[in-house]
Amino acid sequence: MQLLKDRIRAEGRVLPGNIIKVDGFLNHRVDTKLMREMAKEFGRLFDLTGLTAVLTVEASGIALGAICAEEFGVPLIFAKKAKSDNIEGGLYQSEIFSYTHKKKVTLL
């Protein structure tokens, strides 16, 4: 997607460990128009037949995930990085590596 490439080239910074810092439009400050265009592009690129929800990771993924879920007409589910006391019932969990924090994280 050229619009996203242009924004990364214009505003992104490469940090040690090859992490691309895009907090000016993707995580700390969110450009919702760009997010909407990204959601539309995902809808164009992927077969959404049978899609029942959008799953993303808590924090940075929520903004884009919410706009994608709205665009696709399905609910948003986000995986938490820590169990809270108000979650009941069985949980799915998966271990991932966080490149930002340089450690393994268990998502619930």
What does each of the following model-derived ranges do?
Residues 40-42, 63-64, 103-108:
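A generic local structural motif
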Residues 50-58:
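Short glycine-rich phosphate-binding loop at a beta-alpha junction
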Residues 63-72:
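Short Gly/Thr/Asp-enriched flexible loops that form oxyanion-binding sites at enzyme active sites
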Residues 1-50:
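Active-site-facing substrate-recognition patch
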Residues 60-63, 83-85:
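Short, catalytically relevant binding-site loops at active-site mouths
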Residues 74-108:
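Short, glycine/charge-rich flexible loops or terminal/linker lids adjacent to PRPP-binding catalytic cores
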Residues 45, 59-60:
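N-terminal leader/targeting helix
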